[in-house]
UniProtKB/Swiss-Prot annotation:
CDD domains: malate_synt_G. It comes from Mycobacterium sp. (strain KMS). This is Malate synthase G. It is found in: Cytoplasm. The gene is glcB. It is an enzyme of class 2 (transferase). GO terms for molecular function: magnesium ion binding; malate synthase activity. The active site is at R342, D636.
Length: 731
């Protein structure tokens, strides 16, 4: 039984109440009683509206399901379908031309294009690594990944391989030639660096010194001129590059110019995630996340890390200070990524707070209140608030996921306004990032932006969740194509193009981020470097990466592409059509061979089991899960949603049977067990699937997938995780 504190009509879990009262409110000048009274009032006033919005989702889905069932025989009539969606209010009127007016936004969001990390906030080590990933070693990123091949004696090995190191150095020199070219010659021939009359000069041998093609790219340096250990700071497309020189270092001693590393400004922004990458089902979990968020905003989060026989404490990096080129002043740059926080969406409740009747309070309301409160510590430096600051413009950046249409965005705006009143913050302090990951938001994106025109700081496409909603919305229309074929469908290209086009049409360039989705293949960095440049080329000012290393590698793309120049080329264009966006990804004919169907079912079942077993048994919401071919993929609830919805769709239309699903799950459970055999804490599923809560959760996600709200996985996952925690506690 959870110990609770009565606050008006609310019953707050003691762990949450004590944390907020004793830790989060400390140093804010807010009176605890007044704050909790405000929480009570916000919950009472906004809960009915939240419920109405969810009922509207269900009503629209029921009408769409009925429409498709009535037309099960015969071809799909696209014009009739579009008219129907308009009549029921699913498609809403275009709001006309406007420009967003969001003010007080940090440069990292408005004018600096670069990578964005998303990290589970429940894991302090991951959170610290991500916050510190503002700067990353290009040498390390190249040496440790497959961007540099292991051919011709360049194996990684267990100790430094000079052959591989030389390849890294050559790659970095070629990168510098593109990002900060010399007036003549190449960095590949550099034998020395110096500063003369406030300008950087590079020696190309035989005492031949050349400057930069654009001298203004040199913006600072560290160290004493003439000292062997120093660095040069360059800037290109708004991002910084630092060349570290130390001829006595292990790497510098092998380099003819004494360069020991090239450091890139990498994860310009990071999203600390309370949503799809975490497993937070109760007050205990939520407090862990809130406490880490507090440490990040106060600047005092730390974590003991062990590597081999060494243990050290990881803390947040300080800002970086450089001497200006003429030697007369200082330039200070942020040492940490600018932090967003992703709240949960409108659907879920959490028993961290209940009302007097025992009903759980909407988790999105809780997150807005508590993450907003905690973020106040990141707005100013003081003894009470901590030594570091997040925003330098006084803003709090909250990503709001899984909103369906303009009315839900308007509700979020009103929620944030009420939170500001409770916290005593100026209106529009809480900024919103709109995830364009639900079909009704995509189709009405301009109206969604209009609803938050004075708060919006980003729009972002999320292919996986968006595909999950695409399948669920049209669940009754017929069997869908295979998962791997989704990316080649007309609606996908239209979806990605429209997000950029609408963002530009509403004034995002220079004011807010236009984002694109995650690279999930965590070990395939060579492929990422080759392919992910397509996102900035398409107009994205940021795109998601799975690790600090990936952030450093992806940062190269923003040196190679001037995204704001791309915006000028794209402005005024409308590349996406509504007809393409409404094209349902139905299989034109069921021409799959039995082995193809089995492969698709096995692949999805393995993916579901591999992710769900860690979610339920270990409380891990974001996992590097090997797929059926042992390729490591970054999995979160979005990947789970699409996999479970596809199988639910095939089950609904008789492509597969319930027995096919159960048989595949049992077979794939053995595969997942084997993939996790080296984990001493892993509980095998295949030996007794009936008693494995994780196995049963995976099975339920598929068999009951057709009836889950919007195809979301959270209701089943949360219930089953609580069931597992209760079983462990009672053991």
């Amino acid at each position: 039984m959870t110990d609770r504190v009565t606050v008006g009509n609310l019953r707050v879990a003691r762990a949450l109440y004590d944390f907020i009262t004793d830790e989060a409110l400390a140093g804010t000048d807010l009176d605890p009683d007044s704050f909790w009274s405000g929480v009570d009032k916000v919950v009472a006033d906004l809960t009915p509206r939240n419920q109405e919005l969810l009922a509207r989702r269900d009503d629209l889905q029921a009408q769409i399901d009925k429409w498709h069932r009535q037309r099960a025989i015969g071809p799909h009539d696209a014009d009739e379908y579009k008219q129907f969606l308009t009549e029921i209010g699913y498609l809403e009127p275009d709001p006309g031309d406007f420009t967003i007016t969001t003010a007080g936004v940090d440069d990292e969001i408005t004018t600096t294009a670069g990578p964005q990390l998303v990290v589970p906030v429940l894991n302090a080590r991951f959170a610290l690594n991500a916050a510190n990933a503002r700067w990353g070693s290009l040498y390390d990123a190249l040496y440790g990944t497959d961007v540099i091949s292991e051919e011709d004696g360049a194996e990684k090995g267990t100790s430094y391989n000079r052959v591989r190191g030389d390849k890294v150095i050559a790659y970095a020199r070629e990168f510098l030639d593109g990002a900060a070219p010399l007036a003549s010659g190449s960095y590949a021939d550099a034998t020395g660096f110096r500063i003369e009359d406030g300008q950087v000069q590079v020696e190309l041998g035989d005492d031949q010194w050349v400057g930069l093609a654009d001298p203004d790219q040199f913006v600072g340096y560290t160290g004493e001129l003439g000292s062997p250990q120093w660095s040069i700071l360059l800037r290109n497309n708004g991002l910084h590059i630092e060349i570290l020189i130390d001829p006595d270092s292990p790497v510098g001693s092998t380099d003819k110019a004494g360069v020991k590393d090239v450091v890139l400004e990498s994860a310009v922004t990071t999203i600390m995630d309370f949503e799809d990458s975490v497993a937070a089902v109760d007050a205990e979990d939520k407090v862990l996340g809130y406490r880490n968020w507090l440490g990040l905003n106060r600047g005092d989060l730390s974590e003991e890390v062990s590597k081999g026989d060494k243990t050290f404490t990881r803390v947040l990096n300080p800002d970086r200070t450089y001497t200006t080129p003429d030697g007369s002043g200082e330039l200070t740059l942020p040492g940490r990524s600018l932090l967003f926080v992703r709240n949960v969406g409108h659907l879920m409740t959490n028993d961290a707070i209940t009302d007097a009747e025992g009903n759980e309070v909407f988790e999105g309301i809780q997150d807005a209140l508590f993450t907003g409160l905690i973020a106040m510590h990141g707005l100013k430096e003081s003894d009470a608030n901590g030594p570091l600051r997040n925003s330098r413009t006084g803003s709090v950046y909250i990503v709001k996921p899984k909103m369906h249409g303009p009315a839900e965005v308007a509700y979020t705006v009103d929620l944030f306004s009420r939170v500001e009143d409770v916290l005593g913050l100026p209106q529009n302090t809480l900024k919103v990032g709109i995830m364009d990951e639900e079909r009704r938001t995509t189709l009405n994106l301009k109206a969604c932006i209009k609803a938050a025109a004075d708060r919006v700081v980003f729009i972002n496409t999320g292919f996986l969740d968006r595909t999950g909603d695409e399948i669920h919305t049209s669940m009754e229309a017929g069997p869908m194509i295979r998962k791997g074929a989704m990316k080649s469908q007309p609606w996908i290209k239209a979806y990605e193009d429209q997000n950029v086009d609408v963002g530009l049409a509403t004034g995002f360039s220079g004011r807010a981020q236009i984002g694109k989705g995650m690279w999930a293949m965590t070990d395939l960095m060579a492929d990422m470097v080759e392919q992910k440049i397509g996102q900035p080329k398409a107009g994205a000012t940021t795109a998601w990466v799975p690790s600090p290393t990936a952030a450093t590698l992806h940062a190269m793309h923003y040196h190679q592409v001037d995204v704001y120049a791309v915006h000028k080329e794209l402005e005024g264009k409308q590349r996406a059509s509504l007809d393409d966006l409404l094209t349902i990804p139905l299989a034109k004919e069921l021409a799959w061979a039995p082995e193809e169907i089995r492969e698709e079912v096995d692949n999805n079942c393995q993916s579901i089991l591999g992710y769900v077993v860690r979610w339920i048994d270990a409380g891990v919401g974001c996992s590097k899960v090997p797929d059926i071919h042992d390729i490591a993929l970054m999995e979160d609830r979005a990947t789970l949603r699409i996999s479970s919805q596809l199988l639910a769709n095939w089950l609904r239309h008789g492509v597969i049977t319930e027995e096919d699903v159960k048989t595949s799950l049992r077979r794939m459970a053995a595969v997942v067990d084997e993939q996790n055999a080296k984990d001493p804490d892993f509980k095998p599923m295949a030996t007794d699937p009936d008693s494995s809560i994780a196995f049963q959760a995976a099975q339920e996600l598929i068999l009951a997938g057709g009836t889950q709200p919007s195809g979301y996985t959270e209701p089943i996952l949360h219930r089953r995780r609580r069931e597992y925690k209760a079983s462990v506690a009672g053991a």
